[in-house]
Amino acid sequence: MPDETLRKDLPEVDPSEIEDSRAAIADEHRSFLEKVMVRGGLADPYDARDITEVVFRVMRDLMTTQAADHVEGELHKQAYPTEEKELQKLEIAELWRDTNPLVGFLSRVRPPWQGPGIFKIDSDRFLFRVANEGGLPPTVDREQVVKAVFSATKEELSEERIQEIASWLPGHVRELWEQA
């Protein structure tokens, strides 16, 4: 009789909603994509991977090729330990590099998208691109997701790289970077 309720005076509790400290994984033991997924409120590591690639793409668009190469040089850790072949050997540095060969080539030969002009990336355009290119549903807070990627990324970088990236980010996005 598993469906029978014995004590009707107690509220019904969904066991999946109970946080058991024995089952919780300490944040320092989470992988890069798990951190992005949990902190950003994303459904799975594939969503975390996709949005991380977009945030990284917009960040690279703001930087010189040399600065982007410095960052990539520090991101050689496994992004998500799993048995799934698609994510199995994925390094954080691979998320930093653009997966589209043409875009990757163009980003290496063009100057940073800063300063006056129609291609300038300010904070609003940064967040707009993340939301649109990342395919974020309207229920997901784009700033929360960006901060999730930023905080997971900062944990992988030296203080010198963290400061270098901050110097390239526009106003409000720089504040998000510093808060992460």
Task: Give names to the regions the model predicted.
Residues P2-A180:
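General marker for long, soluble alpha-helical cores
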